[in-house]
Amino acid sequence: METGPHYNYYKNRELSIVLAPFSGGQGKLGVEKGPKYMLKHGLQTSIEDLGWSTELEPSMDEAQFVGKLKMEKDSTTGGSSVMIDGVKAKRADLVGEATKLVYNSVSKVVQANRFPLTLGGDHSIAIGTVSAVLDKYPDAGLLWIDAHADINTIESTPSGNLHGCPVSFLMGLNKDVPHCPESLKWVPGNLSPKKIAYIGLRDVDAGEKKILKDLGIAAFSMYHVDKYGINAVIEMAMKAVHPETNGEGPIMCSYDVDGVDPLYIPATGTPVRGGLTLREGLFLVERLAESGNLIALDVVECNPDLAIHDIHVSNTISAGCAIARCALGETLL
């Protein structure tokens, strides 16, 4: 039975769960298990209970990529890493291959007028999801929920882990960089700095701060959440990406679960204390659902292998599923 908010762009309420079990954008295995765990938790059935018809859309062979990653770790040559001024763009070939597969899957979904719910995997997979959504909705705004800005270029990245760089690829900031990995030159790079807003930031590298300021990107840190409250921040973010229409227009949400405080979501790769409460994190997507303008959602960076106790797995996976359900119409009353 259909319940809750209406979706202006998906009145047929058809949805595809795109599985993106990729961990190569960072160095910790286990995050590729996120989609499997969320499905095991009953996510697909609970979405159907909200009135959506669903289908699964696998984007890649999980075992194949895990095998490639393990082979690369055993390699003495560094595998597909690219050296740039002494810093590695780590696993660049695998990131390029995986994100193109995700792009192909999400493109198929959105061109069929189905809502793409993409389950990661690390946040590098957003290179594929956002690029595909922008093909269909070039005026879409992007809300990036994260403790981190993920806008390092391959020149500024301190770690070389490409899950910290997807926004720079989406904006085309690496196109003129010497030695830009060939595997990622397929990325259109057409996201405008005026079409993205961040919520939840609290661990931003110095180079990223400069990029955010130089490009005038709307960035709401936890300071802003504390100062204004989560509802006001969401309203400001929506208006930032659609200023001409007072916040009305298609919006994609790419949600890294580390945006929420690790007290609530502990099993994630780069936890940072002082984040959103679980209720704030859920209210955020409830408000997006209420707007009627949500067109796509990523839920990424759930890593069950990093749990210290079983309850940490349960808390993390249940929270990831709750984010998806609330974005898709679940309400408290």
From Swiss-Prot:
It catalyses: L-arginine + H2O = urea + L-ornithine. The modification N-acetylmethionine is found at M1. Induction: By arginine or homoarginine. GO terms for molecular function: arginase activity; manganese ion binding; ornithine carbamoyltransferase inhibitor activity; zinc ion binding. Mn(2+) 2 binds at D146, H148, D256, D258. GO terms for cellular component: cytoplasm; cytosol; mating projection tip; nucleus; ornithine carbamoyltransferase inhibitor complex. Mn(2+) 1 binds at H123, D146, D150, D256. InterPro entries: Arginase (IPR014033), Ureohydrolase (IPR006035), Ureohydrolase_dom_sf (IPR023696), Ureohydrolase_Mn_BS (IPR020855). GO terms for biological process: arginine catabolic process to ornithine; regulation of ornithine metabolic process; urea cycle. Pathway: Nitrogen metabolism; urea cycle; L-ornithine and urea from L-arginine: step 1/1. The modification Phosphoserine is found at S16. Keywords: Acetylation, Arginine metabolism, Hydrolase, Manganese, Metal-binding, Phosphoprotein. Substrate binds at H148, A149, D150, I151, N152, S159, G160, N161, D205, T270, E301. Its EC number is 3.5.3.1. The keyword Coiled coil does not apply. NCBIfam families: rocF_arginase (TIGR01229). Homotrimer. PANTHER family: ARGINASE. Present with 42800 molecules/cell in log phase SD medium. This is Arginase.
